[in-house]
């Protein structure tokens, strides 16, 4: 395994784009991997491709559209569920949650890391300022890292440098990395796939949970500068 290689789960959003720039400054080679799981906001894949080109990093998409056939989420293209309600399978979770999505992403990324000889994979997950998804928490990440390494006789590290950063701190991190303008104008967060309306914090409908979280973070980021 090469310490200089890192594989990243890359959606083209604020978190994973900031993460990609962070990794590019620390590793000799960085590979970006996106996942097409029949999400409503599939425009994020187009944004991811453009950002990967701007960062001059290799990027490939793994198709996972079968997920729509085996579980529920308001994020799926064919779902008529309105955002902001409880999940059909678990009332304690938001209906934007895709059951086991991160477990699947991480497992595939772990396999990909073995293929390219990477000893690190990186995720843009955070438990400090998140949408209520249990698979974004540190205890889950540590558990799946342990399980996957046991099951493959490897010692691949899962890096989560954003784990304890809120959205305001992520905007500050992007600024410190010199990519704040890129994050605002090129990344995509909106669950509705809105790319026509540019707000101070970026493109989006301004109403969905993802937009609200990003807006709140940007306003706090701006407030901290005063």
Curated annotation (Swiss-Prot):
It comes from the Bacteria. Keywords: ATP-binding, Ligase, Metal-binding, Nucleotide-binding, Queuosine biosynthesis, Zinc. The keyword Ligase applies. GO terms for biological process: queuosine biosynthetic process. Catalyzes the ATP-dependent conversion of 7-carboxy-7-deazaguanine (CDG) to 7-cyano-7-deazaguanine (preQ(0)). Belongs to the QueC family. This is 7-cyano-7-deazaguanine synthase. It comes from Helicobacter pylori (strain Shi470). The lineage of its organism: Bacteria, Pseudomonadati, Campylobacterota, Epsilonproteobacteria, Campylobacterales.
């Amino acid at each position: 395994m090469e310490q200089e290689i890192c594989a990243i789960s890359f959606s083209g959003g604020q978190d994973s784009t900031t993460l990609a720039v962070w990794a590019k400054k620390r590793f000799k080679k960085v590979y970006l991997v996106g996942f097409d799981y029949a999400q409503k906001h599939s425009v994020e894949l187009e944004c991811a491709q453009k950002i990967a080109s701007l960062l001059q990093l290799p990027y490939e998409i793994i198709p996972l559209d079968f997920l729509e056939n085996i579980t529920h989420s308001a994020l799926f293209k064919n779902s008529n569920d309105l955002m902001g309600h409880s999940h059909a399978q678990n009332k304690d979770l938001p209906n934007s949650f895709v059951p086991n999505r991160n477990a699947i992403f991480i497992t595939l990324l772990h396999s990909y890391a073995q293929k390219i000889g990477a000893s690190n994979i990186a995720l843009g997950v955070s438990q400090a300022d998140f949408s209520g998804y249990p698979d974004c928490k540190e205890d889950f990440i540590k558990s799946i890292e342990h399980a996957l390494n046991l099951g493959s006789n490897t010692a691949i590290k899962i890096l989560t440098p954003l784990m304890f950063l809120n959205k305001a701190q992520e905007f500050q991190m992007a600024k410190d990395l010199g990519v704040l303008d890129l994050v605002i104008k090129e990344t995509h967060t909106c669950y509705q796939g809105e790319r026509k309306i540019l707000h101070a914090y970026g493109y989006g409908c301004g109403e969905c949970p993802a937009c609200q979280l990003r807006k709140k973070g940007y306003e706090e980021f701006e407030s901290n500068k005063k």
